[in-house]
């Protein structure tokens, strides 16, 4: 970002008792407002363990005329850093303590003062992304190779909310596979190999499913009778579904007039 032969226009020291990602993001967001600054040096000092280490870094910042940016959650580190920065007369920006103090004052809630809490949130974020990718891959019986990795398997006839429920749970970090139950298609042997799989069977009354399928047919602009929205066919499918539920030892959930959130809440309790 800068020429070794020339002093940078701006030096920034990023100090944190965690990885320091929060401060780096704030710095990069701020620097976008200064496109004319071409020579910038950013030095990172993550995982600060003691005040002596902090003091050494601040003295070095004084020597190099650097701006210090911190996300120190440990209040003792913060106080020590602020005092020395004031004594050394160096710019010291503390992203965490002011906002923590204001939120504490407004809510009367005490902060956990845990370093790396944001990183844990990031880990949860990536877990959700992985779960979403899994749910898409294993939606509607598309794949079975790694179905044993699923936190839950959802099975049911068409229009019992298998996909919406899978995606909702995936957004909460659960790996969900779902398989449609069709009269002419057997459940793959691969599914029966994984005895640990928690299986949930979705069902509803024939009238309820018929109404939903009729609406689906209208949306698709189709006309004329078909097996898809035939009451006799739906009854056969539901009888077949009950047999499959028993074979898979599935927990049965009636989704009739039930929100996705309600069904998901029940599944979460079972996981």
Curated annotation (Swiss-Prot):
It holds the Pfam family Kinase-PPPase. It catalyses: N(tele)-phospho-L-histidyl/L-threonyl-[pyruvate, phosphate dikinase] + ADP = N(tele)-phospho-L-histidyl/O-phospho-L-threonyl-[pyruvate, phosphate dikinase] + AMP + H(+); N(tele)-phospho-L-histidyl/O-phospho-L-threonyl-[pyruvate, phosphate dikinase] + phosphate + H(+) = N(tele)-phospho-L-histidyl/L-threonyl-[pyruvate, phosphate dikinase] + diphosphate. InterPro entries: Kinase-pyrophosphorylase, PPDK_reg. ADP binds at residues 156-163. Keywords: Kinase, Nucleotide-binding, Serine/threonine-protein kinase, Transferase. The keyword Kinase applies. One of its GO terms (molecular function) is ADP binding. Its EC number is 2.7.11.32, 2.7.4.27. The keyword Kinase applies. NCBIfam families: PRK05339.1. Bifunctional serine/threonine kinase and phosphorylase involved in the regulation of the pyruvate, phosphate dikinase (PPDK) by catalyzing its phosphorylation/dephosphorylation. Belongs to the pyruvate, phosphate/water dikinase regulatory protein family. PDRP subfamily. This is Putative pyruvate, phosphate dikinase regulatory protein 1. It comes from Staphylococcus saprophyticus subsp. saprophyticus (strain ATCC 15305 / DSM 20229 / NCIMB 8711 / NCTC 7292 / S-41).
